[in-house]
Amino acid sequence: MCGIVGAIAQRDVAEILLEGLRRLEYRGYDSAGLAVVDAEGHMTRLRRLGKVQMLAQAAEEHPLHGGTGIAHTRWATHGEPSEVNAHPHVSEHIVVVHNGIIENHEPLREELKARGYTFVSETDTEVIAHLVNWELKQGGTLREAVLRAIPQLRGAYGTVIMDSRHPDTLLAARSGSPLVIGLGMGENFIASDQLALLPVTRRFIFLEEGDIAEITRRSVNIFDKTGAEVKRQDIESNLQYDAGDKGIYRHYMQKEIYEQPNAIKNTLTGRISHGQVDLSELGPNADELLSKVEHIQILACGTSYNSGMVSRYWFESLAGIPCDVEIASEFRYRKSAVRRNSLMITLSQSGETADTLAGLRLSKELGYLGSLAICNVPGSSLVRESDLALMTNAGTEIGVASTKAFTTQLTVLLMLVAKLSRLKGLDASIEHDIVHGLQALPSRIEQMLSQDKRIEALAEDFSDKHHALFLGRGDQYPIALEGALKLKEISYIHAEAYAAGELKHGPLALIDADMPVIVVAPNNELLEKLKSNIEEVRARGGQLYVFAEQDAGFVSSDNMHIIEMPHVEEVIAPIFYTVPLQLLAYHVALIKGTDVDQPRNLAKSVTVE
């Protein structure tokens, strides 16, 4: 959600800002803007409703010169998408961009109006601009004004502030919304995502909760909310510079679907040794903590929640550990009973998901045994604040609809299951089967991807549909959930998923010739039960699309389409059966002409409630 880029240098920074915004487009937005100040203090601001390209065209028509600037892509929360609501916002010489939500913006707005300030937008961000302006009028430096203003804000914010009268400094503050500083030679940068800054630096400092940073061309000083200076470690990024390049693919989502075999290989690299899972990266004390685990609580949102749901079956059936999975936004607002020796596992692609972070922080107060983050972004808030962390190493994922982040999360979770089964002293064949399955997984997915044309042809049947139903049983039920989520996200078809055994309890009423029913049916002990559910749909004239192995015993007919799958090891079947559902959603969206990579109303990383 939303994107921030800032730069302070001797050279003109407008193109750096625009390129940074282009690299953040995947996060979702409805408007874009930037402001640049030259050495004499002349400020130029441009804002446009729509895509970054429209802003870039405006910058060509009205060239911006100056070595200090901030830029933003907005995803509307307070105030409709419009040019007047687009960032940056200005209060005389104070210029502000902001991600997040200021919960007390209304009383602050009234106070500032009483002091003579006029508001021209509907946004909560304009409150920050006027508030900093007011505090600066009370005396002191911009940093001192920001230190006085920030405690007055309630809510989540990542904000960057500049004063056109003093273009040698940027101020930034972070509470609940990520900011990262990029370190250069005689120039420095700031953004909401390190991907925005990879063209200009690979050295980064991640701001921590409550940090306030003062950035000049030659220095970065960081303070806590009391004004005391603090030190933050800088890291070298391992992200690829060309992560934002689609290459031969039409969309990022398509590229990321096809990257899954290599992404999973990267996830496994260095983690399997002598036929066992090796998670020594967790540190020397991890085994002691993990051996005490008697219960697992998983928190996640969206696609990550679905991966947690799959892993619940694994933790309980393979490692013998009770497991609960909860949507993070629900967990954080209810009173919950903590099970004895319960490990909190959080799942997030970005590591900045607001509700998941809040749930992690709450778990520390509630007395969980420990916390483990499974994440795709090293150095993210979730990773820094957890006791243990495992990286998925999927590479940058840009498409809003998650694909490779999901399958690599499942890969890491399955390795963790193997590790816990060994620590619990269970039969060594459990770990052996997991390792064997994971090692085979990349080639199995490559086999599946070779059948893309079959899925593409199948997608034609969905082009005029408004609803779809997905069914699965056991650990394939969450895969049905994920398939439905993918279809609704990018094709805008209303899709729901049910455990197939629930058909008689309501969903069967929906079945008719206009309701496509997608079934994931691998060869396992639930296949015969699933066949009975399929017959219930068939008897009522539903259009069935069944993904099953050749020897599963299904026969195609006018209303039952069998999509034959290659044989796959049972333990990795949930990961494998995800891929055809990703392809189906992608091709249906293509036919319907939707924006595959940036579907309406959605953002890649949800960093506010």
From Swiss-Prot:
It holds the Pfam family GATase_6. The active site is at 2 (nucleophile), 604 (for fru-6p isomerization activity). Its EC number is 2.6.1.16. One of its GO terms (molecular function) is carbohydrate derivative binding. Residues 2-218 form the Glutamine amidotransferase type-2 domain. Keywords: Aminotransferase, Cytoplasm, Glutamine amidotransferase, Repeat, Transferase. SUPFAM superfamilies: N-terminal nucleophile aminohydrolases (Ntn hydrolases) (SSF56235), SIS domain (SSF53697). Residues 286-426, 458-599 form the SIS domain. One of its GO terms (cellular component) is cytosol. It comes from the Bacteria. One of its GO terms (biological process) is carbohydrate metabolic process. It catalyses: D-fructose 6-phosphate + L-glutamine = D-glucosamine 6-phosphate + L-glutamate. Catalyzes the first step in hexosamine metabolism, converting fructose-6P into glucosamine-6P using glutamine as a nitrogen source. It is an enzyme of class 2 (transferase). It is found in: Cytoplasm. It comes from Escherichia coli O157:H7. This is Glutamine--fructose-6-phosphate aminotransferase [isomerizing]. Homodimer.
